[in-house]
């Protein structure tokens, strides 16, 4: 599980948006920084996180971030 999560994080930035959507869940509207917002947790998400601030590197890497969209991201 731990190694799987590390692999997911290391591969996240190189993943296309379509593959991220397929592996992570449904999407809602995009933020001003084009960060994809996830409204569903599928495929092993532990719990939903609500993002309230934008730090692109941290949000995308750690929580597949929603930025300012106010949506729900999945922590892995």
Curated annotation (Swiss-Prot):
This protein's name: Protein sigN132
Biased composition (Low complexity): 14-33
InterPro entries according to UniProt: HssA/B-related
Region ranges (Disordered): 1-33
Pfam families according to UniProt: Coiled
Compositionally biased region (Polar residues): 1-13
